[in-house]
């Protein structure tokens, strides 16, 4: 059913990437490979966590949800982009654009909340090990994930409803490869001050506040380690937190650089590069980060492969 907006615009044109037509095949192959790696890698993480009882812990519970979110996050933008990357611009209907905006914001915020929950889990494991099992109970972990879903859904719904109230000018070309909310607001003929206020407020609540909580958590972890600076303790902390810190740096580095730092002269191209980093590259790298630097994940993978070999015999 057609959304009730104040605009006669029936579709938008996504300009996609600033590339030459002959480069379309290369970009199609590249992004298709990255998307397949994202889906298969994160599905493997979910499978390993489900099958290996040693991974039925709070940290891996959050990781399985993060893997699902990463698959969904990339799936919001990449498949649509792949269908027309060799024949830009990319047409997208008004309804599809609003829906894409909703799910993009939803999974982006959910990613942020889940990464924060994982930092809280690491903080409790290192700073309060005696109370860890009691505090990080199965019900507590499920509650953290459920609250993350509810808040992310509410934020995305608010942005989408406000977007649907806007009128759009004759120019309906979006200088991006997906329906980016900021780019859409620039095309509007309506007053977008309320939208901008909500973006700023929600950005603080969904991105900057979780990032601050992560920094505080790791600050407390570092302080705890330095109180008893043994080589074994430092190595254990790095093993426990190293993978998560890498994900934090990739995800928040891209988003903060895109939305919270002063714009540069080549703002459009920089926006596209930063968006590719946190919508395509980061979800693709997460399985490698968590598997290559994690003994438990590597052990679970070896057991799965050994079982497969025995079954084939």
UniProtKB/Swiss-Prot annotation:
Single Gene Ontology BP term?
G protein-coupled receptor signaling pathway
Which GO terms fall under molecular function for this chain's record?
Answer: G protein-coupled receptor activity; olfactory receptor activity
Which residues lie toward the Extracellular compartment?
1-25, 79-97, 164-196, 262-271
Record carries keyword Cytoplasm: no
In the bilayer, the protein is annotated as: Multi-pass membrane protein
Source domain of life is Eukaryota
UniProt keyword annotation of Transmembrane present = yes
Cytoplasmic domain ranges by topology: 47-57, 119-142, 218-240, 293-313
- An annotated GO cellular component: membrane
Q: Which residues cross the membrane?
A: 26-46, 58-78, 98-118, 143-163, 197-217, 241-261, 272-292
Cysteine disulfide partners in this protein = 97-189
The family database entries (Pfam families) matched by this protein are listed as: 7tm_4
Q: Signal sequence span per UniProt?
A: none
Cell location? Cell membrane
Q: Which residues are glycosylated?
A: 5
Write out the entry's keywords from A to Z: Cell membrane, Disulfide bond, G-protein coupled receptor, Glycoprotein, Membrane, Olfaction, Receptor, Sensory transduction, Transducer, Transmembrane, Transmembrane helix
Q: Which InterPro entries match?
A: GPCR_Rhodpsn, GPCR_Rhodpsn_7TM, Olfact_rcpt
**What is the role of the protein in this entry?**
Odorant receptor.
Q: Which family does it belong to?
A: Belongs to the G-protein coupled receptor 1 family.
Protein name as catalogued: Olfactory receptor 1J1
Gene name, per UniProt, is Or1j1
């Amino acid at each position: 059913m057609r959304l009730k907006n104040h605009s006669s615009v029936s579709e938008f044109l996504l300009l996609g990437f600033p590339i030459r037509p002959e480069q379309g095949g290369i970009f199609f192959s590249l992004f298709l490979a990255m998307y397949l790696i994202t889906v298969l890698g994160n599905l493997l993480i979910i499978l390993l966590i489900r099958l290996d009882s040693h991974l039925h812990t709070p940290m891996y519970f959050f990781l399985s949800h993060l893997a699902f979110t990463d698959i969904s996050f990339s799936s919001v933008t990449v498949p649509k982009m792949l269908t027309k990357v060799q024949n830009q611009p990319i047409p997208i209907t008004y309804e599809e654009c609003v829906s894409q905006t909703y799910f993009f914001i939803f999974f982006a915020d959910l990613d942020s909340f889940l990464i924060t929950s994982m930092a809280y889990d690491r903080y409790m494991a290192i700073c309060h090990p005696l109370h860890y099992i009691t505090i990080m109970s199965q019900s507590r972990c499920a509650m953290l994930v459920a609250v993350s879903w509810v808040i992310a859904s509410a934020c995305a719904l608010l942005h989408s409803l406000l977007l649907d109230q806007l009128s759009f000018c004759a120019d309906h070309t979006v200088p991006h490869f997906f329906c980016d909310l900021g780019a859409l607001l620039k095309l509007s003929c309506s007053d977008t001050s309320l939208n901008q206020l909500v973006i700023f407020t929600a950005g603080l609540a969904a991105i900057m506040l979780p990032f601050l909580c992560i920094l505080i958590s790791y600050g407390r972890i570092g302080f705890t380690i330095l109180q008893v600076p043994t080589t074994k303790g430092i190595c254990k902390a790095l093993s426990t937190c190293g993978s998560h810190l890498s994900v934090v740096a990739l995800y928040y580095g891209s988003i903060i650089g895109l939305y919270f730092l002063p714009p540069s002269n080549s703002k459009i191209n920089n926006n596209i590069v930063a968006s590719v980093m946190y919508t395509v590259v980061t979800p693709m790298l997460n399985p490698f980060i968590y598997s290559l630097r994690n003994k438990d994940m590597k052990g679970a993978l070896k057991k799965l492969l050994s079982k497969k070999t025995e079954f084939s015999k």
